[in-house]
Amino acid sequence: MSTFAAPIYAEANREHLLAEFARLRTLLTGDQAPGAGPLPWDCDQPPAADILTAIFDLSPFERDLLLLCAAVEMEADLGELCGRLTGRPQRNSPTFGLALSLMPNPDWRALAPASPLRYFRLVELEPGFGLAAAPLRIDERILHFLAGSNRMDARLQSILRFEPPTAPLAEDHQELLDSLLRDCDARPETISLHLHGDDPAAQRAIAARIAQHFDRHLLILRAENAPAAGADLEQFLALWSREALLLPAFLLLDWHGDAPIANLRALAERIPTTLLIASRDAEKLHRLTWRHEVNCPDPTAQRRMWQSALAAVVPAKILESNAQLDTALDRMAEQFRMSADTIATVAAAVANEPDSLAERLWQNCRAVSRPQLDLLAERISPRAAWDDLVLPDAETAVLKMLVSQARNRMTVYEHWGFASRGRRGLGMSALFSGPSGTGKTLAAEVLAAELDLDLYRIDLSAVVSKFIGETEKNLKKVFDAAEQGGVVMLFDEAEALFGKRSEVRDSHDRYANIEVGYLLQRMEQFQGVAILTTNTKASLDKAFQRRLRFSVDFPYPGAAERERIWRRAIPSQTPSSGIDPARLAQLHMTGGNIRNIALNAAFLAAETGQPLSMSHLREAANLEAAKTERPIAATETRGWE
């Protein structure tokens, strides 16, 4: 980002730099004495050389030495002159010894390790020489600065990015910002701030506003890009220390990704400039950091944010005439957890579609919730409806109660005040238990379709790790990615994590219970719907089961249920002959098996060019039985000719 963009300034700075080079040439040649007075300057902003001198507090000799290194890069004859004077014409570089002998106010401290020229890497010494004889080169970043281009060092561009102070803030976050700015103004020399919580966008927006308050840019370093201890860290510290002064800028360490904490702590403890940290957890990296919590606004505040964002882009007449909008805003505020910036973006995206405003808002909210979770879980497109689900009436009633509560959370939790004492335990969590194929995943599809939400399947057996602490990290990744809340999460194979509790005999047992507790805690806090499935409910500890909001048993279907499943398994447009659902129901199979048999039988019929028949279904049933290693009794397929 350039701060010297004006053409008038650029030309004046070039002329000033050329005059400085001419002055240095007279010092090297001894043709005449340097001018006594300051060079003329008519711009409001000082020349780049003067800015650089002030930033790094350079002495007159250090300034001249730096300008000499710049001069040999920009004017070939000066490089040749230095080569002749040093007796090494092939190098065309100045040396410290040359500067000490020909320039006024010589000072050996100018190239001491702690001097600005060395500490901030403004100049580089060619290795293999003594201090006085070493050829000197100006760093490329500094050369461009002197020439009037203030752009971030190329070595930092791949790991740092600018964060403009343009994102809107929720009311609570604005109040926190105002308080932080008062504290910062009182102690500007000790700004070291850690913002933690579940709203990373708001944390970045607050940090950008703090930087703006002090006339600084904000640059973000993601935790996974943090340099490892050693040479990488040393180079980063040197380059960043310089960059923070040149741009100028504050650094925000974005600790929402994965990174070795040792690397982050080493960076936080050693960085010599203002440091801001953003993370989900409150674990401390730096002993001098002030810590403040920044979470997503509660549903009531989110509703106000939606109203404000829509009012800014949609005509009032359209908002007032949209009867569905109030209900939609209630559902969105309770279902999704979004930053003020995301809400403003979604509102702007639908502003030109007033006829379907409520529906477009909802679908856009779903879309922005997907990207991170798509990388970690399987997204299932829910197509099932209540008629596809064959369950006893009591179990169906529990599922419909879950849907009803999910739809009416805003009314009960916020309008009626049930969330006023805290939101712990208010998440929509459920346990689905029953043999494989009895409809647990199908029921999750029905719920997702009814709530108009995406369904994501997470295989807990793949999440669980034998390494201590890794399972919790894997679960954290999933829930953090789903934080915006607009999804139904289906955790399959709960028994992989939830065994019956036993006495804690070693660290593995203790960590297993910690991991179970962590999963339940995140489910209780989750803004969407979280479902655990298990084939063996008895293997789950009762204490864990009690923490789940709903529990639905999926029994093995009886004959009447199997007949209903068969009737649903074969589409009405399928050519068929002699299909008898009552006889088919004699076969003791689950709904999942029945659907597999119907599908395989249809392919058998299609291959022969005949309508689907009972014989096709018997052949497919034998294939399914062989796959599941379950023998079929003769009575089960009697009459399937």
Predicted regions and their residues:
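Intrinsically disordered, low-complexity N-terminal extensions of AAA+/P-loop NTPases
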Residues: 1-313, 323, 331, 624, ...
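AAA+ ATPase "lid" subdomain C-terminal helix
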Residues: 74-75, 334-363, 367, 586-615, ...
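Walker A/P-loop NTP-binding motif of AAA+ ATPase domains
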Residues: 174-322, 396-400, 404-584
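Short conserved motifs of the RecA-like P-loop NTPase core
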Residues: 320-336, 345-346, 380-384, 498-500, ...
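Long, low-complexity segments enriched in small/aliphatic residues
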Residues: 371, 375-379, 391
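AAA+ P-loop ATPase central domain
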Residues: 360-363, 367-368, 372, 382-384, ...
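Dynamic helix-loop-helix/coil hinge segments at AAA+ ATPase domain boundaries and subdomain interfaces
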Residues: 161-178, 381-411, 588
